[in-house]
Regions:
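Conserved Walker B catalytic segment
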Residues: 1-12
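Short glycine-/polar-rich loops that comprise or flank the Walker A/P-loop
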Residues: 7-9, 31-35, 247, 295-298
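Interdomain motor-coupling "hinge/lid" segment immediately C-terminal to the ATP-binding subdomain
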Residues: 8, 16, 21-143
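Hydrophobic/aromatic beta-strand patches that form the interior of the parallel beta-sheet core
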Residues: 12, 35-37, 201, 250, ...
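Short beta->alpha connector loops
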Residues: 17-20, 182, 255-257, 278-282
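Accessory nucleic acid-recognition modules appended to NTPase machines
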Residues: 88, 92-266
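Active-site beta-strand-loop-beta-strand hairpin of nuclease catalytic cores
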Residues: 265-273
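Catalytic cores of nucleic-acid endonucleases
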Residues: 278-319
Length: 328
């Protein structure tokens, strides 16, 4: 109607279930008439702006590494807070006003309950229980040393074909994101996707923490959060930041199993492999193997260590990984 009879009006609409709505039979969609934007949870810099103000957030966006090096302890503290609170707007708003981690967890649990109650409202009844199994398995899947999604962990004898539809519904629902394995670190990465392997990440670090029952105290007190659960919360955070920057992350592992990159992204006409390290651990054996094997000129390690450009290898602090395009 508006396009044909009232083209002078510009309409903005928001919805939570666009991916599900388009799955319905006989559902029409005005191709070429709509610009779509994907809203994701708030990233780390948006969280900093909400709870600490504009100056520090602006410095993060500007990738002012000299200035940021002087406040690295504060940034690490804020990063831990973000891992607990996450980026769901209601939770961030409440936390910015109260700095109450218990209240943040309560709101996250409400969001989880709303997600789970909606499974039965939109998805076919025959797959609802399988959707719940996949959803509830996320903390355990990401806590493994090898974070490749394993269908057999869902229930004894589970096979991919039994759960593929339920997994696709969760992806369309927008609360999980699949990061595929690639057989080679060559551009474009989509040409080398290996359909047999993938990692599955949650929509948000805070939601993942609440889903796993992780105590905020474990995250906030000391460096344990970066090593607990095999660094799953840290890797979840990096996945979120990459997605927020419009990246389509993948990961690579060698056929022999002796090397793996946590992520890889298409970058400036080539591929940029990325390794997520716990705390200030700077060993990057797998990353070096990957760079040598595929003759890559640049690779990224992200950790709590300071920014360091060593030519082929650049270390980007975890709290600055959202600015990877400026620093890599």
């Amino acid at each position: 109607y508006f396009n044909e009879l009232a083209p002078g009006y510009h309409i903005v609409a928001a919805g939570s279930y666009m991916g599900l709505a388009l799955r319905r039979e006989n559902e029409s969609f005005p191709v070429g008439k709509i610009d779509q934007l994907t809203m994701r949870p708030m990233g780390f810099v948006e969280f900093v702006r909400a709870v600490d103000g504009n100056p520090l957030a602006d410095a993060i966006l500007a990738a002012d590494m000299d200035l940021l090096a002087n406040v690295s302890e504060k940034l690490e503290r804020l990063l831990k807070e973000y891992l607990v609170v996450g980026g769901m707007p209601e939770v961030v708003s409440a936390f910015a006003a109260s700095h109450d981690f218990i209240e943040a967890r309560r709101l996250q649990q409400q969001i989880i309950e709303a997600y789970e109650s909606d499974f039965g409202k939109h998805a076919p009844a025959r797959i609802v229980e399988r959707m719940r199994l996949v959803w509830k398995s996320l903390p355990g899947q990401l806590a493994k040393e090898n974070k490749k999604f394993v269908y057999g962990a869902l229930r004894p004898g589970a096979r991919a074909r039994d759960f593929e539809e339920s997994l696709q519904w969760l992806m369309d629902y927008g609360i999980v994101h699949k990061v595929p394995r690639v057989s080679a670190l060559r551009a474009p990465l989509t040409s080398y996707e290996d359909l047999s392997g993938f990692k599955l990440f949650c929509i948000d670090t805070g939601i993942l923490g609440a889903l796993s029952g992780l105590s905020p105290a474990i995250v906030l007190n000391g460096p344990a959060v970066f090593t607990e659960f095999k660094g799953s919360l840290t890797e979840q955070y990096v996945a979120q930041e990459l997605l927020l920057q419009g990246k389509t992350p993948a990961y690579w592992s060698s056929s022999s199993g002796n090397a793996e990159t946590d992520f890889a992204i298409d970058h400036a006409g080539t591929v940029l492999p990325l390794e997520v390290k716990a705390a200030e651990n700077l060993k990057a054996k797998s990353l070096r193997i990957a760079c040598e094997k595929f003759k890559l000129e640049r690779c990224v390690r992200t950790s709590l260590a300071a920014y360091r450009d060593e030519g082929t290898l650049v270390n980007i602090p975890l709290w600055e990984i959202g600015q990877i395009d400026k620093l890599a």
